[in-house]
Regions:
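Repeat-blade elements of multi-bladed beta-propeller folds
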Residues: 1-24, 28, 38, 63-88, ...
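Short glycine-rich loop/turn motifs that provide flexible caps or phosphate-binding loops at active sites
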Residues: 16, 124, 148-149
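A short catalytic or substrate-binding loop motif that flags glycine-/basic-rich loops and adjacent residues
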Residues: 147-150, 196
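Extracytoplasmic/lumenal domain signature
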Residues: 25-65, 72-80, 92-143, 173-203
Length: 203
């Protein structure tokens, strides 16, 4: 993590966004890579992990999700929800529900053009991928949004009066990237990213 988390004093939980794995190419680290590209909740009294939600699994796009979600309560289907809202680098706006026991998926909608996710599970929020859009070691792929994400580090803002969310978005920018083999050397970059380019285009 490298952006300060959010704090819910009623629940005694602090919410933090987490980065992507290294090297960048997911084929070098099989599995979901649990807790990467996620929001985690920490008990502020003990420092222990209380719960989590992973926005996307086995990242290969440098879509880290280090921005902490906003603690915004909202209504869905006539129900008031103690919410977490996150504008992801993966180009989706995530609506979650926070409680002492869990972080539950509610909804997710793209806020910029996104061509990697083919479906999001309605119960869990787990996305499915178009694997032709997922770069790997020696495998070039083009994808949207770019490696800069639908939103990079600048924070979002929320107006509680108008109920509007303001997102410093990177729209209409895509990337082409290929991974390369990399050896771990302490103190040096450990990305395994080969040639990449960004373009203001839709693939």
């Amino acid at each position: 993590v490298w952006i300060t988390g959010s704090y819910d004093h009623e629940l005694g939980l602090s919410y933090w966004g987490t980065g992507n794995g290294g090297p960048w190419m997911g084929d070098t680290r099989p599995g979901d890579n649990l807790y990467a590209t996620s929001v985690i909740a920490l008990d502020v009294q003990t420092g222990e992990l209380a719960n989590h939600h992973q926005y996307h699994w086995n990242d290969s796009w440098d879509w880290d999700e280090v921005a902490a979600p906003l603690l915004i309560d909202y209504a869905r289907n006539g129900q008031n929800i103690k919410g977490l809202i996150h504008a992801g680098r993966n180009g989706y706006l995530w609506f979650l529900e926070r409680s002492e026991e869990s972080i539950d998926f509610v909804d997710a909608k793209p806020y910029v053009y996104q061509d990697v996710f083919t479906n999001i599970d309605e119960e869990t929020g787990r996305p499915e991928y178009d694997m032709s859009k997922k770069p790997g070691t020696g495998f070039e792929a083009s994808f949207c949004p770019s490696l800069w994400g639908g939103k990079d580090w600048p924070p979002v803002a929320f107006d509680p009066t108008s109920r509007l969310l303001f997102i410093p978005a990177n729209d209409n920018v895509c990337s082409t990237m290929v991974g390369e083999e990399v050896q771990y050397n302490p103190g040096q970059a450990f990305m395994g990213r080969g040639q990449s380019e960004n373009g203001g285009f839709f693939i």
